[in-house]
Amino acid sequence: MSYWKRIELKNIDIIKEKSLEFLKMHTPYMMKESFKGAFISLAPYRFLQKTPEIAESLEEHGLFPEDANIYVMWNNKDSVVHKDYTDSIGRINIPLLNCEGTYTTFYENVHSRRLVLPTGAPFFMTTNKDYIEVDRVEIMQPTIIKVCDGHNVLMDETKVPRITLTLTCTPDAGLLLDD
């Protein structure tokens, strides 16, 4: 199974524009002062209900959005090698801001234990250092990434914040990694 796969989504420019506008107008996450952790749920803001273009675009792939989160970074220390705490194989990441020259990297030999971020999001923190990078992708368009394996984000720290929208779908978007 591949670690990532780019996909085409119709209305991607509208999705990106509405997502950024939503974050600016309805959340504090564009400001560094509000930073408590990189992975932030948009469920309390009813984001998916306010951006129907996401569901319309995913429907063409036989997918239905279940959850929307953002991954916000201000520097490379904001992300570490980890596995997402989820039953999902993959999520769809959509670049929203300052993603040029940044990479999602994938690793083998990752050992981990469950932790909870200050944002309340659980994840699997890596407990070893002898993991091996096996792949990487620049998130420049909607991309399914394999979140059940070890991964990390490396960013260009001169362009902040770096923000991706990350979508959990039914059926699992990770199943498309084999196509």
Predicted feature descriptions by range:
Residues 73-143:
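Catalytic core of non-heme Fe(II) oxygenases with the double-stranded beta-helix
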Residues 60-61, 104-107, 176-179:
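Short, charged, solvent-exposed linker or helix-capping segments at domain edges/interfaces
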Residues 1-72, 78:
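Non-heme Fe(II)/2-oxoglutarate
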Residues 60-64, 82-86, 134-136, 155-158:
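A general structural signal for short secondary-structure junctions and capping/turn motifs
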Residues 11, 96-98, 169-171:
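Non-catalytic surface loops within mature trypsin-like serine protease
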Residues 4, 67-68, 78, 89-93, ...:
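Extracellular structured ligand-interaction cores
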Residues 116-179:
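Catalytic core of Fe(II)/2-oxoglutarate
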